[in-house]
Amino acid sequence: VNQQSTASFRDSCGYIFEHGGEIYRCIEPIYHARYRQIMASGLYETLINRSLLIQHIEIAPGSMPFAPMEKITLKPQKLNLITYPFEWCFCQLKSAALQLLEIQAIAMEFGMTLRDATPFNHQFKGSRVIFIDTLSFDEYQEGTPWIPYRQFCENFLAPLVVAKFRDPSFLKFASLSLQGIPLDIAVKLLPFEGYLNFGILVHLVGHAKLANAKGGEGTSKHRVLSRTGLVALIDSLRRSVESLSMPSNRRSTWSEYRSESNYNSDDILEKESVVQTFIRTLSPKTVLDIGCNDGRFSRIAVKCGVASVVAIDSDHLVIDRLVRSLIQ
């Protein structure tokens, strides 16, 4: 018997299950036509070629005991590490936001659109973000608005804005609420400087006022938005996200550790030698660098041939700097 993952309870189109230590995804008949459209239109191939979407292989119906005839069963590429948005640094969430907007823009070229916009649909392969929800697409209908607009603003834009202007610890808000930061709360946290950013003014401040005027409702499914208008909306969101960055002069407990520590050059070289010897002796497949700071020893592990290196630090700024150095 295949055990359905409890993480799939919200998706009526399909579910995740595990069999023999492997992860599979079963697509319900209600989504078969959309899935075939994704595959036949060229959207899947385009996203794969651009390294934006997780790859999968399709299991022939009835070919295996766990692949029922009436459903489509996929075996997605397995990731070495699963992380969650409240564990990410600023630039990781920003990368996921920009990727989602890029995918939305591409999907429209193939007559499709994203039906939700949650950071939980993204993971990381190394330092690169990748979209993992193949069932998140729907057919685009001319004149319809972007349904997950508010969801995007609350789950991506609002956390990034508040982290920039207040404190990066607000990125952990996702551990308390899977719905992100409510628009009205995000606006209350904005300093005056935030109102000078046109994108923030439109997509957070104006959006919050409009939502409050409608009694807290999200994007209206009855609103008419032309294709040109939707393309402009996605582009405006992209520019708004791109304009956000962490202040370069912000400091934290460990952000200046390398320059202010008591280690001299000989001490550092000796420590590097010890780490190299340790790794080459044990030949581990995975190394966990706890308190990695700028990732000096994580990089050494990679150079020594370790297949998977996980760098962890509780200091948001040092992790943000490390990730930025890897993706630039």
Residue ranges of model-derived segments:
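Catalytic activation segment of kinase domains across protein kinase-like and atypical kinase folds
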Residues: 113, 118-164
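Conserved structural core of kinase catalytic domains
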Residues: 56-95
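Conserved SAM-binding motif I beta-strand of class I
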Residues: 308-313
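Conserved class I S-adenosyl-L-methionine
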Residues: 283-293
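S-adenosyl-L-methionine
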Residues: 323-328
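Conserved SAM-binding loop and adjacent beta-strand
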Residues: 244, 259-274
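Conserved SAM-binding loop of SAM-dependent methyltransferases across substrates and taxa
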Residues: 294-306
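N-terminal auxiliary segments of SAM/dcSAM-dependent transferases
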Residues: 150-245
